[in-house]
Regions:
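AMP-binding/adenylate-forming catalytic core of the ANL superfamily
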Residues: 88, 105, 241, 364-454, ...
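Conserved AMP-binding A3 loop
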Residues: 29-33, 150-174
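Conserved pre-ATP/AMP-binding loop-to-beta segment of ANL
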Residues: 13-16, 137-154, 161, 184-190
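Gly/Ser/Thr-rich phosphate-binding loop
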Residues: 238-243, 252-310, 323
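Conserved AMP-binding/adenylation subdomain of ANL enzymes
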Residues: 173-193, 197-240, 254
């Protein structure tokens, strides 16, 4: 098996693969023949520089065709690709390199300053360099097995450093299940998954799942603008729109909604959507938002099927063939029935193979009489904000590096648009006073120390943090007090 050969090379060469809408307004259509050739030549270029089967290639490129071709080139060689979000700071990138030891980094030139500050100590190439996508060498696709590694994605833990989740080739082929039963594009459709490159949802839904169904993918490399988002859906005749819950909420609150002639499907995943947002979108477009659920480690587990019964607020039922159950309020999965289940973790916070036996998701879920599942929250301390999963340890570590901070604890606070935001409870050192100016200073300090989406939008002061007898912070007390 090889995704590059079996899907990209095997497609109709003249069929539409990508529609590129660049930041500068440029528009270009990419046929499968162009994508296949560009990826094959990039694979040849990488092979000549020592990249081979099992080697790690890190990408720091936005939602551009160059990112897609870099992914396909890695699949072609049997290399393992780690797509990184462009929001990462130098410290984040350096930490990632320390965990995965990449053979090569492929980057957008706009990220040059970040990479130079990170001083990664490994080869870096920029996607605008001559010869990467039009060089003389073409690499043939190697034959791979389902458990051969292909993809890495970092996930935030509740303590310690983030872990790198390693997926096998089966992860790519396994997307066929959710592509058919949840995303559900038809052959020739245009699908727009707005997830930024580097996030687990982007790896599967920006182009992999659409291509498995014979659909094309829209790539829009620009910041989120609610009005521009709707205009582009109409202009490009998007058939299936996949957005984060926060994006649906913001658009519903800020832009007059209207039906788009070609739009047939709205899907979302990452956190629950409130009933009012669901109502506004359905009333304006005539379409329900079909929710789904998955994790970095598992891929998609549930979904509201196209054409099936819609249960507002539900994340659907288990995908066909996937066995799920609830144990003490927690959703549990049988890995043997999950075709996209991960191979294991890399990193100091949990190396080795995936744990055997049932997979405990750490998510509290309830099930109604008809088998529809409803998300109720996390059993651990991970914060889900605007679809981002944020581990409190990283934010706390950044805060305590500030000279004014003696201790800090981070929990989730409810937010109408983002679902949750990061709330920091801070104990100051002697001589410092909690003021709005200091709160803003701590926010800017955190943005500089780690990825900016992790900064605490709420900063509160406390004389001390609630702790257990052994000295552990009682986060549940802080959550309840918020």
């Amino acid at each position: 098996m090889n995704f590059a050969r079996d899907v990209v090379d095997a497609a109709d060469p003249s069929a539409l693969a990508l529609v590129e809408r660049a930041r500068d307004g440029r528009r270009r259509e990419w046929r499968f023949a162009e994508v296949a050739e560009g990826a094959a030549r990039l694979a040849g270029w990488m092979r000549a520089r020592g990249v081979g089967r099992g080697d790690v290639v890190m990408t720091l490129v936005g939602n551009r065709p160059e990112w897609v071709m870099a992914m396909v080139a890695c699949f072609r060689l049997g290399a393992v690709v780690l797509p990184c979000p462009e929001q990462l700071r130098p410290t984040d990138l350096a930490r990632s390199v320390g965990v995965v030891s990449p053979t090569l980094v492929l980057a957008d030139p706009r990220n040059r300053a970040t990479l130079e500050a990170a001083a990664l100590g490994c080869p870096v190439a920029y996607v605008d360099e001559s010869g990467l996508f039009d060089g003389p060498d073409v690499a043939e696709a190697v034959t791979l097995r389902p458990l051969d590694p292909c993809l890495l994605t970092f996930t935030s833990g509740t303590a310690g450093e983030p872990k790198a989740v390693l997926h096998g080739q089966r992860y790519l082929a396994g997307q066929a299940v959710q592509a058919e039963h949840w995303l559900a594009p038809a052959r020739g459709d245009l699908v727009w998954c707005t997830a930024a490159s580097g996030w687990s949802k982007s790896a599967r839904n920006v182009f992999i799942a659409p291509w498995l169904r014979g659909a094309a993918a829209l790539l829009h490399d620009a910041r989120f603008d609610p009005a521009a988002r709707l205009e582009l859906v109409e202009r490009e005749r998007v058939a299936v729109l996949c957005m984060a819950p926060t994006e649906y909420r913001v658009i519903a609150a800020r832009v007059p909604l209207r039906a788009a002639p070609a739009l047939r499907g709205l899907v979302s995943a990452g956190e629950a959507l409130n009933p009012e947002v669901l109502r506004i979108w359905q009333q304006a477009t005539g379409l329900p938002i079909r929710d789904g659920y998955g994790q970095t480690e598992t891929g998609q587990l549930t979904g509201m099927p196209a054409g099936g019964e819609i249960r507002p607020g539900s994340m659907g039922r288990a995908l066909p063939g996937t066995r799920l159950w609830i144990e003490d309020g927690e959703l549990v999965a049988d890995p043997a029935t999950v075709p996209t289940f991960f191979l294991g973790y890399l990193g100091a916070d949990g190396g080795g193979e995936a744990p055997g036996g049932p997979w405990r998701t750490g998510d509290r879920v309830r099930e109604d009489a008809d088998g529809f599942l409803f998300f109720e929250g996390r059993t651990d301390d991970v914060i889900i904000s605007a679809g981002y999963r944020i581990g409190p340890f990283e934010v706390e570590s950044a805060l305590v590096e500030h000279p004014a901070v003696a201790e800090a604890a981070v929990v989730a606070a409810p937010d109408a648009e983002r679902g949750s935001v990061v709330r920091a409870v801070v104990v100051l050192r002697s001589g410092f006073t909690g003021t709005p100016e200091l709160a803003r200073e701590l926010q800017e300090h955190t943005k500089a120390a780690t990825a900016p989406y992790k900064y605490p939008r709420v900063v509160e002061w406390a004389d001390e943090l609630p702790k257990t007898a052994s000295g552990k912070v009682r986060r549940a007390v802080l959550r309840d007090s918020g």
